[in-house]
Amino acid sequence: MPKRGGGSSQRYNNNVGNGGGRYNAPEDFDDFDVEDRQRRKDRNKRRVSFKPSQCLHNKKDIKLRPEDLRRWDEDDDMSDMTTAVKDRPTSRRRGSPIPRGKFGKLMPNSFGWYQVTLQNAQIYEKETLLSALLAAMSPHVFIPQYWRVERNCVIFFTDDYEAAERIQHLGKNGHLPDGYRLMPRVRSGIPLVAIDDAFKEKMKVTMAKRYNIQTKALDLSRFHADPDLKQVFCPLFRQNVMGAAIDIMCDNIPDLEALNLNDNSISSMEAFKGVEKRLPNLKILYLGDNKIPSLAHLVVLRNLSILELVLKNNPCRSRYKDSQQFISEVRRKFPKLVKLDGETLEPQITFDLSEQGRLLETKASYLCDVAGAEVVRQFLDQYFRIFDSGNRQALLDAYHEKAMLSISMPSASQAGRLNSFWKFNRNLRRLLNGEENRTRNLKYGRLACVSTLDEWPKTQHDRRTFTVDLTIYNTSMMVFTVTGLFKELNDETNNPASMELYDVRHFARTYVVVPQNNGFCIRNETIFITNATHEQVREFKRSQHQPAPGAMPSTSSAVTSPQAGAAAGLQGRLNALGVATGPVAILSGDPLAATAPVNSGSAAISTTAVAPGAQDESTKMQMIEAMSAQSQMNVIWSRKCLEETNWDFNHAAFVFEKLFKENKIPPEAFMK
C-alpha cells in the first residue's frame, strides 16, 4: 500500500508533506547508498566508551583521607565492600560487550567473610537446605556459620573464599527434592555484632579459659572460631569488639605481659590507643596472619616496651623487599625489640655516650614536709565530710574573718557550660572590661565565702581520686592544693532515685591556711572546676566498686570514741606545728560532731577503755559502720572482718590492708 505523501518509499523522495514534491532520480543517490551501508556496518561494530565521573568534579576530590577509608572499611553492613557483580544487570551501555558468563567473579575482601543468601528458602529446614548445597558442591564441603532465617530468605556466612566462590557459581544446579532451585547469591559481608553485657560476659569467660597465669600470656588467636563463641560472632578486627576485649584485660589482668592476636583479620590498631597506660607490662605481641597494611598503624604501640613482635603474613611485611630495611623500620618504632617474627635480632650498634640523669619519678602527691601529711589528711577528711553534708554553714569556723574565695572555670567552648557554677565564674580572660567586673565575683569575708559555697548543688567527693601537693608547711602557714573528682547530684534531694543522676566534675582547690588566735583557719582559697574527661569518667565509675585503702587508719593510730574524735579531730594533729600550747582548731568540734557521728580519720572507735571482744552492741555497730566507711566494704563483710579479729579494730584494719594488697578480698565484699 503506497504511503501518504507520494511514492511507495521516501528513499528517493525528499517530500515530507502530504502532497507531491520535487522528483529526484534514483541514480542521484548512488553515492548515498554506499555511505549508508558503510555507516550501518560501522554501527554494528562493538565499541567501548567511558562515562565521565559524576561526583569527582575537581582533582582535589580524588585524594581521600586515611580516616575516611578506615571508616568505610569498618562499615557495619559492609555495603561498600561488596565486590561481586550483580546476578542480573539491569542496564548496559549500547555497544558494550555482553558478559559471557551469568555470574561475575567474587573478589576476596580484606576481612575474609562472605554472606550467602537463599531467597524464599525460609520455609525449609536447615538440614534440607544444607544437604542440597553439599550435594551440588560435591566432592567439596564447607561449614556454614551464623545461620539465621529472615522474613523471606535464609542467610549464612563463611570465611572460606573458595567455598563462597563455588556457592556463587552453583546457579540452577542446586535444587531441593521438590524441584525448588536454590539460586544462592554471594557477596562480601560480615555477621551482625551487638555488644551488650551478655556479649562481654561470654568474651570474658572465653578469655579466662585462654589465659595462662604462669606466663601471664593471653592467646586470642582466631578468637572468633572458639567453640565457646559458636552462637555469637566475635570479630577482633572490629574496633568496638577489640576495645571491649582490651577493657576486659585492663579490668581483670592488668599485669598482662604477652598477647597473641594471630589470624584475626586485624587491619587497624585504633583500639590500642592509650594501651601503655592500661596494659603497661605488655612486652610480647603476636600480630601474624592479619591485614595490617603498613607499619604506621603500629605507632599507637610506640610507648610500650615491646621485646618480641610477630608481623609475618601481613601486607606491611610484603611492602619491603629488603628484610634488613623492614627490620630497621620496625626497630625505629620499637628500639628495645629483641625478637622479630621468631628470629632473634642482632644487637644494635650504639655509641658509648654518658647516660644522662633521669627525670624524677612522678607521684600522685608532693609533700614538702612529711610531717604535714597527717595534718592535711585530717583536714581534708573533716572539711569534705561537712562540705558534702546538707549543712555547709558549719564551715564558717573554718574560714578567716577576711578570707577571700575565687572560683573559675574554662570557657564553654572548651569544657561545656557548667550551669550550676557559671554565675560564680571569675575567669579573667572572660572579664576584660573594667576593674569592677574582675572583682565582682571575688568573695571577701567569711560569710560571703561560705554563702557562695552553700549555693552550690549537693556534691559527693570521691576520696579515691584525690591528689595533694603540700608546697609550704611551717609555723606561719601551710599551702596545699587538692585535685580530684566529685559528683554533682540532682537538686531533687527528696527523691531517692535522684541520687543516681549525677554529672562527674573535676576540681582543683588551693588553700592558704594561717594561724588565728589559738588555731588555724583558711585565709585564701581558689577553686577551678571543669567537666571530667571520658577517661576520668570511666576510671571514676570503675573505682566505685573498689576500696580506698589509703583511708584506713594505721595500726599505730590512737583510737578514741566518735565523740572524742569529733571534738579533737585535727586539733591534736596541729599541735605538732608548735604554734599553740592549747587545743588548735581549723574546724570547731561542735559542727563536726553534729554532721559526722563517725570519724573516718585515724580516730574512730575506742579500744583503750574497753577490752577487745567486750564491747556492747551499740559500740559494735559503730565499729562496723566505721570499718565499712573506711574500707568501702559492705556491712556484712565489715562485721565478718571484726568478728574474726575478736573486735580489735586496729588488728582488723591491719588484716584488711594486708589481704587487699594481696587481692584476696572477693569483689562481693564491696557491693553495697
Curated annotation (Swiss-Prot):
Residue numbers spanned by region Disordered: 1-52, 73-101, 541-564
Segments forming domain TAP-C: 618-672
Expressing tissues: Expressed ubiquitously.
Keyword field contains Protease: no
Keywords attached to this entry: Cytoplasm, Leucine-rich repeat, mRNA transport, Nucleus, Phosphoprotein, Repeat, RNA-binding, Transport
Gene Ontology biological-process annotations: mRNA export from nucleus; nuclear export; poly(A)+ mRNA export from nucleus; positive regulation of RNA export from nucleus
PANTHER family documented for this protein: NUCLEAR RNA EXPORT FACTOR, NUCLEAR RNA EXPORT FACTOR 1
Protein name per UniProt: Nuclear RNA export factor 1
Source species of the chain: Drosophila melanogaster (Fruit fly)
Phylogenetic lineage: Eukaryota, Metazoa, Ecdysozoa, Arthropoda, Hexapoda
